[in-house]
């Protein structure tokens, strides 16, 4: 079955809707999406195929995405610069947490069929390294989202009340941040759960004990992926809001 026409129609409709509603920002976000895909497919994937260090490559790819995208979409200003610094800092922290989680849980990434094929046909590529890089890149989107939101919040609070004490601004910004964290945490989990719905059905009809299923390689991978993203999200909101105060 040839799906080319259908796929292009849906992509075109999505692009048109983004441009109509987002206007200039919508166009810039699409350019940013192109930069993101170019960084991942043009740099990260070939470098991983050559057996490069997954942590260093994922962080480098993340920086290569953030530098142009943040300034392109949000402009060259204090908000973008501070969000960039906060996101990069928290991304490095997320990389450390992901590395610790994978090593302590002894994840091998072999519960996924694609990873098994990579292990079979591309022995020079580290499956665990791919897993780690995936954790880091996966956390990047939510980190960028929360740092930009908190930067905008702090900026608006100071503009509305320039004489406010830093701690007052921090408390007010964190009230907004808590709402954002609450929505983003379950959004993050639901995004992963949606992709793993067939697996969830298989687990529900399995005769294996629940804890044995939850600690299997494939399920533990998704659980830890969501957990690392959620922890990094909370740390980003708290630390970044504090760092932006004068």
Protein language model features and the residues they cover:
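Conserved small/polar residues in nucleotide/adenosyl-binding loops
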Residues: 241-246
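Internal helix-turn-beta structural module
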Residues: 208-240
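Extracytoplasmic
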Residues: 1-9
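Loop-to-transmembrane-helix entry motif
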Residues: 2-3, 50, 54, 176-187, ...
């Amino acid at each position: 079955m040839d799906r080319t026409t259908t796929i292009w129609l849906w992509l075109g409709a999505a692009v048109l809707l983004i441009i109509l509603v987002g206007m200039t920002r919508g166009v810039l976000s699409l350019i940013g999406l192109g930069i993101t895909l170019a960084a991942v497919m043009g740099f990260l994937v070939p470098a991983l195929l050559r057996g490069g260090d997954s942590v260093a490559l994922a962080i480098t790819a993340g920086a290569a995405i953030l530098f142009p995208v943040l300034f392109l979409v949000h402009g060259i200003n204090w908000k973008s610069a501070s969000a960039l610094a906060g996101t990069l800092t928290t991304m490095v922290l997320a990389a450390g947490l992901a590395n610790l989680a994978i090593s302590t849980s002894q994840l091998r990434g072999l519960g996924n069929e694609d990873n098994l094929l990579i292990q079979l046909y591309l022995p020079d590529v580290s499956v665990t390294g791919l897993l780690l890089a995936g954790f880091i890149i996966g956390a990047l989107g939510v980190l960028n989202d929360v740092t930009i939101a908190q930067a905008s919040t702090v900026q608006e609070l100071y503009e509305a009340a320039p004489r406010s004490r830093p701690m007052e601004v921090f408390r007010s910004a964190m009230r907004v941040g808590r709402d954002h964290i609450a929505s983003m945490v379950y959004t993050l989990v639901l995004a992963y759960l949606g992709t793993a719905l067939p697996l969830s059905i298989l687990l529900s009809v399995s005769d294996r004990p629940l804890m044995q299923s939850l600690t299997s390689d494939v399920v533990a991978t998704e659980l830890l992926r969501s957990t690392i993203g959620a922890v990094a999200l909370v740390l980003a909101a708290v630390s970044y809001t504090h760092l932006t105060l004068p």
